[in-house]
């Protein structure tokens, strides 16, 4: 029997089979484009679509976790409205004559790194928010849906990390618990898990491998294992 230590974000015990959730990686390549203004328009259309999607997530979250906790999605909308963020993407498109996906990815890396290097723990967590909104924009540019956890039976989700948008879309009758390799007890994902009453561990000292899928496991949020 293997025992892994993590940080509990919500006490409780869950027993069930593991479901390894691995996000489909967004393959972003740098491509030269000719019509920069058309590419800027592509970005803005994708950004506006992301705004609408976040509005829908906010409405769902209000019902699930209340207005105060749903405010994370309003904050995500504000990040997408941020002029520095938009200017960065548009400037990269115009000056380098590259595709919007690449410009968004570069902007995401820049801003998320900037937040991650801050001393304040709350501000550090905003790095994950920048990555989340950027992934949503890139998914829209590619004509894809942003990843979400889908399962047919009650399971313990095992993931590298979960974004707030993925967490709020979890079906509580299908998720016994979740365990992530990364993440923090101060993250919005952790806050949502507590509010939704889902036993969860984050920053767990283990390696995420596909062969764990289907294994029987016990999550004890009281003793952090």
PLM region spans:
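Non-catalytic, soluble scaffold/interaction modules
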Residues: 1-225
